[in-house]
């Protein structure tokens, strides 16, 4: 897939402004993310995904752009596509915060509980045994993990668990999560 129109934003307000004007007319946009070592400001990944969900858009493939940045494609969600568990957690929080737009809610309607149009269906969160064992193996990591917000715990564990079909990624993600949790730091995306 070729990289189309690009957009550089440094905060969620700028991204939300672009989405509010273009979410119904644009087919996609490639958001520019500067690498940390570039020293240039960029919107954090989690903020970008959350704002996209508010308008019924979703992130997809990433590609290198130049020596100091990469790009990620954002586009409207297909009508019958399903939300990942991570995005269900995000949407639940966005609904509670009153940030979801009508367009965003319409795009996820089929993933929502018919009994309550404002509450997405969510599977009960179960921490996989092997991940739990790793977290508990370090008392500092386990203490910090338990103090993180539940939504963050679910998103990060789903991110790790979702890479099981690629064991090298699973190990890399788990190690990175353990390292950051030991420092009591939350993160949005490994680069």
Which positions does each model-derived feature cover?
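Charge-dense, helix-prone N-terminal extensions
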Residues: 1-191
């Amino acid at each position: 897939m070729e990289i189309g129109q690009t957009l550089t934003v440094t905060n969620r307000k700028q991204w939300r402004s672009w989405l509010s004007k273009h979410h119904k007319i644009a087919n996609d946009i490639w958001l520019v993310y500067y690498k940390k070592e570039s020293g240039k400001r960029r919107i954090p990944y989690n903020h970008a995904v959350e704002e996209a969900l508010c308008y019924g858009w979703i992130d997809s493939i990433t590609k290198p752009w130049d020596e100091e940045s990469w790009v990620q494609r954002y586009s409207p969600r297909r009508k019958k596509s399903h939300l990942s568990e991570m995005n269900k957690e995000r949407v639940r929080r966005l609904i509670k915060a009153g940030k979801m737009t009508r367009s965003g809610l319409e795009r996820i309607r089929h993933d929502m509980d018919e009994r309550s149009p404002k509450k997405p269906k969510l599977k009960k969160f179960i921490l996989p045994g092997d991940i739990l064992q790793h977290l508990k193996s370090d008392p500092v990591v386990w203490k910090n993990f338990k103090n993180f917000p539940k939504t963050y715990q679910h998103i990060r564990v789903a991110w790790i668990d979702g890479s099981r079909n690629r064991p090298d990624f699973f190990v890399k993600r788990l190690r990175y999560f353990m390292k950051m949790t030991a420092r009591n730091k939350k993160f949005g995306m490994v680069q």
